[in-house]
Amino acid sequence: MRRGFGPLSLAFFLFLLALLTLPGDGNQGSVAGSCSCDRTISSGTQIPQGTLDHIRKYLKAFHRCPFFIRFQLQSKSVCGGSQDQWVRELVDCFERKECGTGHGKSFHHQKHLPQASTQTPEAAEGTPSDTSTPAHSQSTQHSTLPSGALSLNKEHTQPWEMTTLPSGYGLEARPEAEANEKQQDDRQQEAPGAGASTPAWVPVLSLLAIVFFLTAAMAYVLCNRRATQQNSAGLQLWYTPVEPRP
């Protein structure tokens, strides 16, 4: 008789089955069993800041594989050790939807949020509104963003992002903008009316010319037909045969 599977063989078989059917994280859109890597970064390797920023920006999904984590980008995949600091930061950043493109919101949009929040207290100077709420939201956003995102915000700050408008600027400029828009509408309405008066005679003259031409052609055809009929009648009378006398 054949011997059955022993406990060790059964345990090894179950372990292989568990590795093959290891489920992925559904929130990150990972595919079960897709642990192939285009590039593997060894543990302890110093990653350039530009490479890390590129992964943050184009990260679409990640998959938890045995002993490492696979990050899926737009055109390739990058793998790193699950215990590495940069790997854990990327996973936390993607789970909080602060980086990557898999959420329908790019990292480029997220990294400009602190500048937008800092404009609120400056634009609200001179108004009786409470400034504690913008400060609280600013501190909350700074605390939720990772350290790499804060450094990127400092590096990529543009001069136009820090410009502030004086209070009441929109209220004063709005009537002038409405008046200018109204004047432009009036000019656009007057221009077609003035230009349409002269070309209005063109189709009328063309129509009259066509009617005159058709009338002359019909008169010519009728005159020719009548003259032809008269000539044929005269010929018939001229060549009328005479019956012989008996």
UniProtKB/Swiss-Prot annotation:
* Keyword Chloroplast attributed: no
The record, for InterPro entries, names: CXCL16, CXCL16_dom
Point to the regions of Polar residues compositional bias: 128-146
> A single GO BP annotation from the record?
positive regulation of cell migration
What is known about its processing and modification?
Glycosylated.
Where in the body, by tissue, does this protein show up? Widely expressed. Not detected in purified B- and T-cells.
Q: Which residues lie on this side of the membrane: Extracellular?
A: 27-201
Topology of the protein relative to the lipid bilayer: Single-pass type I membrane protein
Which controlled-vocabulary keywords does the entry list? Answer: Chemotaxis, Cytokine, Disulfide bond, Glycoprotein, Membrane, Signal, Transmembrane, Transmembrane helix
What is the name of the protein in this document? C-X-C motif chemokine 16
